[in-house]
Swiss-Prot record:
InterPro entries: Met_Sox_Rdtase_MsrA_dom, Met_Sox_Rdtase_MsrA_sf
GO biological process: cellular response to oxidative stress; protein modification process
Cellular compartments per GO CC: cytoplasm
UniProt lineage: Archaea, Methanobacteriati, Methanobacteriota, Stenosarchaea group, Methanomicrobia
NCBIfam families: msrA
The protein, known as: Peptide methionine sulfoxide reductase MsrA
EC number: 1.8.4.11
A Pfam short name: PMSR
Family, similarity comment: Belongs to the MsrA Met sulfoxide reductase family.
Active site location: C37
Annotated source species: Methanosarcina acetivorans (strain ATCC 35395 / DSM 2834 / JCM 12185 / C2A)
Length: 188
């Protein structure tokens, strides 16, 4: 993403922008994905042209307003997730799905690399029936093409409550100076 575009992205920790994650506004849509540790996943989506805001948080569990420490105990059922606000005139939901499939291993259950636990599971949380259909179709397409050696274990489920993670997790790689080119193939 070019510098100007990145500067215009909303920051999940600024007070005036936190509402965008629940009510994106006219012409914008939201998507929610879980694919391992949310720090790298968020950074990958932040690099996509058309993504106007990202936030990391917890979704898919049964515990209200969990903390990072609670999610890590495996007792809450939440996955580390990323809420993505995007402009569908610039980037389609299908394009976001393509990013999702490429930035993690959707064939490992409750694990991504060295991170092990239910909070690291692969999940597409759909916000409407169109997203559900697109997610199911993209998964089926990958399975038919034999892209992965092992079966895809990604859950495709309706979005549940998204609880914003603590401020120190938001844009973690940027704050720590670990900006990565996770998506070199997705750059213009």
């Amino acid at each position: 993403m070019e510098g100007n575009e990145k500067a215009e992205q909303k920051n999940a920790t600024s007070e005036e922008s936190t509402d965008i994650f629940e009510n994106p506004g006219e012409g914008l849509e939201k998507a929610t994905f879980a694919a391992g540790c949310f720090w790298g996943i968020e950074e990958a989506f932040r690099q996509v042209k058309g993504v106007v805001a990202t936030a990391v948080g917890y979704s898919g569990g049964h515990f209200e307003k969990p903390t990072y420490e609670q999610v890590c105990t495996l007792d809450t059922g939440h996955a580390e997730a990323v809420r993505v606000i995007f402009d569908p005139k610039v980037v389609s939901y299908k394009n976001l799905l393509d990013v999702f499939w490429k930035i993690h291993d959707p064939t490992t259950k409750n694990r991504q690399g060295p991170d092990v636990g239910k909070q690291y599971r692969s999940v597409i949380f759909y916000h409407n029936e169109e997203q559900k259909a697109a997610a199911l179709a993209s998964k089926e397409e990958l399975e038919k093409a034999g892209v992965f050696k092992n079966p895809i274990v990604t859950e495709i489920v309706p979005v549940s409550e998204f609880y914003m993670a603590e401020d120190y997790h938001q844009q973690y790689f940027e704050k720590k100076g670990f900006l990565q080119n996770i998506l070199r193939s997705f750059k213009k």
